[in-house]
């Protein structure tokens, strides 16, 4: 979370450092293990740990192939090895991410809304998101929207057409 002048919000950064401390060594090991699993299965993957301001946040893995189903196979093996305790999984197309449970847009939005209400009182909140995981913060909003071809829109369309 950033302050209005674009600088790091130290209070929020401190909260995140506390929430993520147990994952700081685990995330690089998880990234390496996921890439090795892909290699063992015969797939070309790339991956990294997303880090900002000296704090490791989550693991991202993508494939270099033509079939997004590859990541589902890699995920199944990572899960079978019990490597994701305390983590959320975000899988969407060529994107497989492992996020510690203390890292969630919802928590940041809750904090931002709390601060905003202190300064400006209660006011309407609009939310915009494109993935199913965005629903975690979007339900804090009075109204929300999603792009027509997003993962979220496709999921809603599938539910309507069932």
Where do the language-model regions lie?
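Conserved acidic, metal-coordinating active-site core of Asp-based
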Residues: 30-126, 132-140
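Asp-based, Mg2+/Mn2+-dependent phosphohydrolase catalytic module
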Residues: 119, 139-162
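Short, surface-exposed, polar/charged, turn-prone segments marking secondary-structure boundaries
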Residues: 18-22, 86-88, 116-119, 153-156
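Short, polar loop motifs at secondary-structure junctions
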Residues: 129-133, 148-151
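Active-site phosphate-binding/coordination module
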Residues: 1-39
């Amino acid at each position: 979370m950033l302050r209005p002048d674009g600088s790091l919000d130290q209070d929020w950064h401190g909260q995140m450092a506390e929430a993520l401390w147990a994952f700081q060594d685990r995330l690089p090991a998880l990234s390496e293990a996921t890439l090795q699993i892909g290699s063992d299965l015969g797939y070309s993957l790339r991956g990294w740990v997303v880090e900002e301001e000296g704090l490791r946040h989550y693991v991202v893995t993508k494939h270099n192939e033509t079939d997004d189903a590859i990541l589902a196979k890699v995920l199944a093996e990572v899960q079978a090895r019990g490597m994701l305790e305390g983590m959320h999984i975000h899988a969407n197309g060529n994107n497989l991410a492992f996020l510690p449970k203390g890292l969630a847009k919802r928590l940041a939005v809750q904090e931002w809304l709390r601060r905003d209400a202190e300064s400006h009182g209660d006011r309407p909140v609009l939310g915009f998101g494109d993935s199913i995981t965005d629903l975690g913060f979007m339900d804090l909003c009075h109204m929300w929207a999603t792009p027509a071809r997003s993962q979220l829109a496709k999921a809603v369309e599938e539910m309507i057409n069932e």
